[in-house]
Every structure is written in C-alpha cells, then in structure tokens.
Curated annotation (Swiss-Prot):
The encoding gene: Ctsh
Protein name: Pro-cathepsin H
Coiled coil: none
Gene Ontology biological-process entries: adaptive immune response; bradykinin catabolic process; cellular response to thyroid hormone stimulus; dichotomous subdivision of terminal units involved in lung branching; ERK1 and ERK2 cascade; immune response; immune response-regulating signaling pathway; lysosomal protein catabolic process
Source organism: Rattus norvegicus
Primary enzyme class: hydrolase
Keywords for the protein's UniProt record, in alphabetical order: Disulfide bond, Glycoprotein, Hydrolase, Lysosome, Protease, Signal, Thiol protease, Zymogen
Glycosylation site list: N228
Length: 333
C-alpha cells in the first residue's frame, strides 16, 4: 500500500569529523573560538581542541568571506561551527542520494488570487515553539508534528505539543526508520491508520530509537486525511499555506545552509530534483523582500539556530528541490 520512499535526516552520530587542511589560526579566530566555546558550553581534550579550533577557523573564514560578498542571506556562528560539513552530514543529514518522487499527489489547486504574504505565526497561537531534534535524524518527525499541531490549532483553537518520539519508535511499518530517517507524508499516514498520536507530555522526546509505547487511550490528535501536493508545484504550496495551514516539505541541505543566520537563503550548490532531498521542515508562511519571493520556514535545530529557529528560502524557483514532496494533514477534530 505504501510505496518505498527515501529517508530524511538519517545518519548515525559518528566521531570522525572529516579532514580539514592545516590552518595558521590567528589571535582573533582563537578569541572567537574561546567565546564560542563558553557560549555553547564546550570542552575538549587537548588533541580534540586543536582539531576543533582548526575546523572552527575554517568555518569562520567561510562566514566572513560569504558576508563580504553580495548574497541574499548572511551567515553566522552557531552550534555547528566546530564541525565540518562531512561530519554534519553524518550526524544530521542523510548522505546518500534520496528520491521522493514516488509521493502521489491528491491535491486539487484552485485559481486564486491569494494574499501577497502570509505568516501563520501572526494568526494567533497556531504555530508551536521551535524544537530541537538533537542527536537523532528525526527532522521528519518534527516537520510532521509541527504541521499537525498547527492544523489542529487552526481547526479547533487548541494548541498542543505532540510526541515526536512516538513517530521515532512506532512508525516503521510506514517506511520510516526512527533516527535513521523518514518522510512527513508517511508519518501522516501512520497517524491516520494508527488512529492517533499522543502528546509530548505523555510520550516525551528522548532523541534515540526506542520501543513503541503508544497508548491509544492517551491519543490527543488525529488525522482524517493526508494531502500530498503535486511534484514541483510551488504555486499549490502557496495556495495551501494561504488557505489552509502550514505545509511540510523536504529539500537538499548543502554546506552553505548550515551557517545561515538571516536573509533569504538561495544556493547554486544544491539540486532541484526530487532525488537529493535530505531534510524536512515546515513552511509557516511566505512573503517578498526587495522583490525577492521567499518562504518562512520553521526548522528543528533549536531556537538559537538561524533567525530564532526559522529561516527564509527563495520561493518560486523550487530552490533545493523544496517542492518535491510537500504535504499536510487534515485533522480530525
């Protein structure tokens, strides 16, 4: 019944950080590394310190070089600044080529017109706080719960916090694989046929694979139907966000995205095909800035990443394949 689809955000937490060319680190870079270590409460062995300083200095230089050029977005230091992109891919992203083109559309697009901008965060208490997936490739679960939390709140006026850990532990029969990855569309199907998902207070997040502990008597949110938006139909995504609720989508994360800080993310290094997506997030709105169309997107790397846990990404160009497998749930309320 369920076609095999790719995994998102999969990957074990490996210790190798990838090779970094030896740098001559200057005093300014050492100062910023020391400050960054204090901010992020980092400690290292002597050997590890030397390696992490090298990686940090390399990332610092990339950030400075990027910000001096004419880009639509700025980079900044964050929790990833002592890691190479090779290490980040092992820890947070699925490193093999992916393909979500098997997702079958059932969305019927209207003719508009639609508002020039939309931000569900400004529509009352209908977008839950930014969460942090931590040391688990579970972005797909946070995209799923974020979409359903908003859909329920919009339909009923009740905001709740749903259990990502239930999806990590229990949704394997729908081609999801816990901390090794999955897709929101498949997670919505699981909730639909499982007849519910528990709240996070009853099924707290631990950020690692565990035994399924679902208790149907404690289910608090339910899915009536799952809507899969047509492959690469970004206009349909706009309609869905404008008229209905936030939309889950996947895209390809490349190195320049990891240090995103502000502005509208756009990249020439990512692919626009459905076979490369490796991270799932939640579109909560859209708009335009200086003639540049963008999506407002909720991430799952904590509120200290990006712009309070959010980022903007260019809209209308299928940037990094973001229109490859978008979906949202219709809640049963």
């Amino acid at each position: 019944m369920w076609t095999a689809l790719p995994l998102l955000c999969a990957g074990a937490w490996l210790l190798s950080a990838g090779a970094t060319a030896e740098l001559t680190v200057n005093a300014i870079e050492k100062f910023h590394f020391t400050s960054w270590m204090k901010q992020h409460q980092k400690t290292y062995s002597s050997r590890e310190y030397s390696h992490r300083l090298q990686v940090f200095a390399n990332n610092w230089r990339k950030i400075q070089a990027h910000n001096q050029r004419n880009h639509t977005f700025k980079m900044g230091l964050n929790q990833f600044s002592d890691m190479s992109f090779a290490e980040i891919k092992h820890k947070y992203l699925w490193s093999e080529p992916q393909n979500c083109s098997a997702t079958k559309s059932n969305y019927l697009r209207g003719t508009g017109p639609y508002p020039s901008s939309m931000d569900w965060r400004k529509k009352g208490n209908v977008v839950s706080p930014v969460k942090n997936q931590g040391a688990c490739g579970s972005c797909w679960t946070f995209s799923t719960t974020g979409a359903l939390e908003s859909a329920v709140a919009i339909a009923s006026g009740k905001m709740m916090t749903l259990a990502e850990q239930q999806l990590v532990d229990c949704a394997q029969n729908f081609n999801n694989h816990g901390c090794q990855g999955g897709l929101p569309s498949q997670a919505f199907e699981y909730i639909l046929y499982n007849k519910g998902i528990m709240g996070e207070d009853s099924y707290p997040y631990i950020g690692k694979n565990g035994q399924c502990k679902f208790n149907p008597e404690k289910a608090v949110a339910f899915v009536k139907n799952v809507v899969n938006i047509t492959l690469n139909d970004e206009a349909a995504m706009v309609e869905a966000v404008a008229l209905y609720n936030p939309v889950s989508f996947a895209f390809e994360v490349t190195e320049d995205f990891m240090m995103y800080k502000s502005g509208v993310y756009s990249s020439n290094s990512c692919h626009k095909t459905p076979d490369k997506v490796n991270h799932a997030v939640l579109a909560v709105g859209y708009g335009e800035q200086n003639g540049l169309l963008y999506w407002i997107v909720k991430n799952s790397w904590g509120s200290n990443w990006g712009n309070n846990g959010y980022f903007l990404i260019e809209r209308g160009k299928n940037m990094c394949g973001l229109a490859a497998c978008a979906s949202y749930p219709i809640p049963q309320v």
